[in-house]
Amino acid sequence: MKAKEWREKSLDEIRQKNKELEEELFNLRMRSAAGQLESSAALGKIKRDIARAKTVLREKGVKEH
């Protein structure tokens, strides 16, 4: 998801999606440790999405205060 798409979401939606992404990252890491991960690129994609979500949360948090 692009940063522009993240910025269009509400704070609650961003927090929920971020939680889902962190759970998915955990699952991918477990699969990687077990040797069952097909593509390590998926880890990077999830990490980037989490970073984008956190960045937008911080931007919106600063604007509201």
From Swiss-Prot:
Keyword set includes Metal-binding: no
PANTHER family: 60S RIBOSOMAL PROTEIN L35/50S RIBOSOMAL PROTEIN L29, LARGE RIBOSOMAL SUBUNIT PROTEIN UL29C
Molecular functions (GO terms): structural constituent of ribosome
Membrane-spanning ranges: none
CDD domains: Ribosomal_L29_HIP (cd00427)
Annotated gene: rpmC
NCBIfam families the UniProt entry points to: L29
Entry similarity comment: Belongs to the universal ribosomal protein uL29 family.
Gene3D superfamilies named in the record: 1.10.287.310
An example Gene Ontology CC term for this record: cytosolic large ribosomal subunit
Pfam families: Ribosomal_L29
Name this polypeptide is given: Large ribosomal subunit protein uL29
Keywords associated with the record: Ribonucleoprotein, Ribosomal protein
GO biological process: translation
